[in-house]
């Protein structure tokens, strides 16, 4: 009897191992969805569609990737869904935004943390910029700050939501200038925040460089400063906030990439971690991203894991007491 039981256990284990091996070898055998926790037209949606455009190539994944927009509550709706309901089978990934989802998890009120997900690879590094409408009376960052100091809490400044990179930059600017802005989180993400600036609904905005670059190319906005350690190649004429006299670093820079839910099979993670960086570095992707003013920064899984951990430390200190 014991011999029969042992044989049955070994047979079951062998079948499970064979099934796992077969799954890893066949994966993916159907299209893969990528959830974007923002509406269509914003920087994350725009870039996600570009960086996944060659997924169907046989030397990449051999299956196309489609986008699932799940906007709402400043990204919370999409990431809550991804952490609690998305199947952990490799056929549903999500775009991540750092510092956004980590900052939200630090402040609470969400169902996820950095430990809820497994990073795959990073595609971009998109710094925050300060923008004003094309006809704004403000032409320099100093003029905007002077107005904020003279009118505490009345310098309306749009951003994509609470605790996104835009909000982090606003908090840093307030601390550096010892003044108070009126930060206005929009419901429609970066695209809505930019529309508020262009339409004159707010005096200024903090947005992604990629969105601002396209808006400036269209003649709709002026870019006053970039929240990074050095000037960006896409807007070399625009000074950093440090150059304007404000002690603001690059903590608000928005890193974007792909992740899967915790519990995804290791062999699937390994395959994605190998192939996704190749997808991001494809020549067609790089050309389209450059044309759209979207800075790229490709990082592998190990580099992203370190970046997540480092950013969490910085954000916990920055958000302390808020």
Give, region by region, the residue ranges found by the protein language model.
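Hinge/capping helix and adjacent helix->loop/strand transition within the periplasmic-binding protein
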Residues: 27, 59, 81-92, 104-192, ...
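Bacterial N-terminal signal peptides that target proteins for export
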Residues: 1-9
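N-terminal signal peptide c-region/cleavage motif recognized by signal peptidases
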Residues: 19-21
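C-terminal lobe and pocket-closing loops
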Residues: 125, 211-280, 310-313
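N-terminal (or domain-start) structured segment
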Residues: 24-116, 154, 162, 175-204, ...
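A ligand-binding cleft/hinge motif common to bilobed small-molecule-binding domains
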Residues: 98-108, 167, 171-176, 203-238, ...
């Amino acid at each position: 009897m014991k011999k029969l039981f042992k044989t049955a256990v070994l047979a079951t284990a062998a079948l499970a191992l064979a099934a796992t091996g077969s799954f890893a070898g066949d994966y993916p055998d159907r299209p893969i969805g990528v959830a974007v926790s923002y509406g269509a037209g914003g920087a994350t949606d725009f870039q996600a569609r570009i960086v996944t455009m060659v997924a169907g190539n046989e030397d990449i994944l051999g299956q196309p990737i489609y986008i699932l927009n799940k906007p709402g509550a400043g990204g919370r709706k999409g990431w809550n869904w991804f952490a609690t309901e998305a199947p952990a089978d490799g056929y549903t990934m999500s775009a991540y935004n750092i510092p956004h989802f980590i900052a939200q998890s630090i402040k609470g009120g969400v169902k996820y943390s950095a430990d809820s997900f497994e990073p795959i690879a990073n595609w971009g590094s998109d710094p925050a910029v300060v923008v004003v409408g094309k006809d704004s009376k403000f032409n320099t960052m100093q003029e905007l700050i002077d107005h904020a100091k003279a009118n505490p809490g009345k310098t309306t400044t749009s951003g994509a939501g609470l605790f996104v990179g835009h909000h982090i930059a606003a908090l840093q600017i307030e601390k550096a200038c010892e003044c108070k802005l009126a930060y206005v989180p929009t419901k429609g993400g970066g695209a809505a925040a930019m529309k508020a600036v262009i339409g004159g609904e707010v005096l200024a905005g903090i947005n992604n460089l990629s969105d601002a670059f396209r808006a400036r190319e269209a003649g709709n906005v002026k870019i006053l400063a970039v929240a990074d350690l050095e000037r960006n190649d896409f807007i070399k004429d625009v000074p950093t906030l440090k150059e304007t006299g404000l002690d603001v670093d690059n903590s608000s820079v928005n890193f974007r990439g792909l992740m899967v839910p915790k519990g995804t099979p290791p062999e699937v993670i390994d395959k994605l971690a190998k192939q996704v960086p190749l997808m991001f570095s494809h020549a067609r992707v790089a050309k389209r991203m450059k044309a759209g003013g979207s800075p790229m920064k490709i990082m592998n899984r190990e580099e992203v894991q370190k970046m997540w951990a480092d950013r969490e430390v910085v954000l916990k200190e920055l958000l302390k007491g808020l």
